[in-house]
């Protein structure tokens, strides 16, 4: 190989290695983000279920004593 091609070949190898590491990092980040979105979706469903249960409990509860007049009036 001519001397002028050697540095180019080394630079190309370095770039290929760098791209391989970047691809691995991107795949890892993608998997992490996917897992986080799944967890966010699960937590959102859980919060909605708690909210629905709270609304149902509030609608079935008697009127709050703060809204009623005291008996001595």
Curated annotation (Swiss-Prot):
Source species, domain of life: Bacteria
UniProt feature, compositional bias: Low complexity: 57-67
Pfam families reported for this sequence: SlyX (PF04102)
Location of the region described as Disordered in the Swiss-Prot/TrEMBL record: 54-73
PANTHER family, alphabetized: PROTEIN SLYX
Family named by the database record: Belongs to the SlyX family.
Record's protein name: Protein SlyX homolog
Organism the protein comes from: Rhodopseudomonas palustris (strain BisA53)
């Amino acid at each position: 190989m001519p001397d002028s091609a050697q540095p180019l070949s080394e630079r190309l190898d370095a770039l290929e290695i760098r791209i391989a590491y970047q691809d691995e990092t991107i795949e890892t980040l993608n998997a992490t983000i996917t897992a986080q979105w799944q967890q966010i979706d699960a937590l959102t469903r859980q919060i909605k279920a708690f909210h629905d249960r709270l609304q149902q409990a509030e609608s079935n509860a008697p009127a709050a004593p703060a809204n009623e007049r005291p008996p001595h009036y």
